[in-house]
Structure formats: C-alpha cells, structure tokens
Amino acid sequence: MRYLIDVHTDERAQQQRLEEDVRRGLTSRPKSLPPKYFYDRAGSLLFERITELPEYYPTRTESALLAEILPGLIEDFLPDDIVEIGAGSSEKTRRVLDAVTAGGRPVRYVPLDVDRLTLEASAERLLREYPSLSVHAVVGDFERDLAHVPPPTGRRLAMFLGSTIGNLDEPAQRRLLADLKALLPDPRDRLLLGVDLVKDVKILEAAYDDSAGVTRDFNLNILRVINRGVDGDFDPDAFRHRAFYNDAAARIEMHLVAESAQTVRLRRLGLTVRFAPGEGIWTESSYKFSRAGIEALLGDAGLRLARWHVDPANYFALALIQRA
C-alpha cells in the first residue's frame, strides 16, 4: 500500500486545546498566545508572503543552503525513510525526494502535521510525482505526538527545518530533542535541523517588522483566529504590532500592544479579559542559536553534531545530527 494516514488529533481535540491555551495564556502575566494559532488559512497565506520579503532571510537562506549541501549529503547518506516534522505542504522536501528517489529507488516519506487536509493534498501530489514513493502521514502535534511516528523501514533521515525549534522555550527545546532522538533508533540514522543564528540586531528586527507591514498583519491575524475559535470580540485595529530582539535571552519577541484600555469578551470560555493602555500579548518567541549552544542542547539529549553547514553570511545553519 503506497498511502497510509494515522490520525492522532482531530477538530474536537484541537478545539479543546485551543480553549485551554487561550484561557491559560490570557489569564497569565504577561498575557500570551501560542504562535501555532497564527496559521489559519489567512495566516498561512500571509506567512507565504513573509517568506518572499527582502527583509525575511530565513526561508531563502535555508533553501539555498539545502540545495548546496544535498549532493554531498545524499552521496554519504542515502536514506530509505524520510520523516518531516511540521511538514505542511512538503515543499521543502521535494529537493530531497528528487535526490533519494532517483532511478526509481523505493523510499517511504512520513510527514507529520496538525492539518489533515494539507497532508492529504500533499500526499496526493507527491505520490503522483514520485512513482517509487510511499507515504505514511501522521496527523498530530509535534510537541505531543512524535511517539506515533511509525518505526523506520531502513536508514532514516528525520528533518525539522525552518528553525521552528526556535519557537519553543529552552525546556521545550530539550524535551523535543529527546523525543527526536527516539526517532533515530539506528546509529546510522540522522536528523537534519534548521537553526537561525545570532546576528546583527538590525537584520533580526527587520525580518520580523518588515517595511510593507506583512508581519504586522500576520501578527494581528491571531486575534481573528481567537475570535472565531472562542467567540471573542477582539478588535485587531485596537492593537499594534511590536517586534524586538531580547539580547539577554537571544530571541526575537513579537507582541500585540493595546493602544488604549480594552475589555475583551471570550464568550465560549465565559471569560472577560481587560487590557491597560500599552499592555501586550506575547505572541511569539524566535530563539537564535550559536553552534556552541546547539551542541550543548544536543549533548543534554544524548545527541551529537555530525556536520554543521552555514551559509556564507553566517545567517543560518543546517545541523546534521546523530545519536551520541
């Protein structure tokens, strides 16, 4: 069978988690919302626009770096099993699949994502384009459901790209790396991790506060997602986007700041939330890394760096990782 799908989260479970996350986040100090709620259909389209902006270097830099290292990577390491965490539409995977399925070589692709419809559409396209490919999709949350990834069919390459690990705080980064280690049972298995590097503050802040205002719109869209999800009455026009680099924590922070006193009703939760003028909602952290910092995180998880590839400007790295 060329296509299987395992479902470990559904709309009901996702709704329950959203309600829990919103209640917890908006009754905390400081108030916060998880960045995964950026990505409804409108938010995903806005993020696609962000990746094309001149200020937003991560996507194009990672893509160019992947194209550069892939021939050597595949020459030394030809996987039978490819796992992609947070796969989305699987666009990043095509370069890898082009290389590993050359000559009709059989390969299994295991994408994990919370969006079942996107996974199904992606699987249909990939199966049509790669006759020797089989797909075993997993609908789930990468922070909860990595244990549901099926055992490997052979030598495995797991991929966690886009520096998505930077959206997690350090304890969550450590937990995730421990979970990722469990996906690499064989010493020959590898993990390819994309990491955004510490760099000039002006470059970092411009990437998250672009001149065209697309990131502003992306950030504000989370309020529309919450309104829809919990029957809220946030007024996005009453908040402004703020993004800055926290040097002490080595992270970009994105916030939505109330322009005036606000009272917001979240009817599905039976919750009223008040904002003082200038009070914010912390919507995203994006941690930036160094090689030494990554090596320390890996060591704590029982992993080690096999290769470290950096672009010429030292903006972004692809780390090839194995069991220690």
Briefly describe each language-model feature range:
Residues 1-37, 44:
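N-terminal auxiliary segments of SAM/dcSAM-dependent transferases
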Residues 11, 30-80:
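Class I SAM-dependent methyltransferase Rossmann-like catalytic core
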Residues 79-88:
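Conserved class I S-adenosyl-L-methionine
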Residues 89-104:
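Conserved SAM-binding loop of SAM-dependent methyltransferases across substrates and taxa
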Residues 112-116:
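Conserved SAM/SAH-binding beta-strand->alpha-helix loop
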Residues 166-180:
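A short, conserved alpha-helix within the catalytic core of class I
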Residues 182-200:
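Conserved beta-strand signature within the Rossmann-like core of class I S-adenosyl-L-methionine
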Residues 203-287, 291, 295-304:
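Substrate-binding/catalytic lobe of Class I Rossmann-like enzymes that use SAM or dcSAM, i.e.
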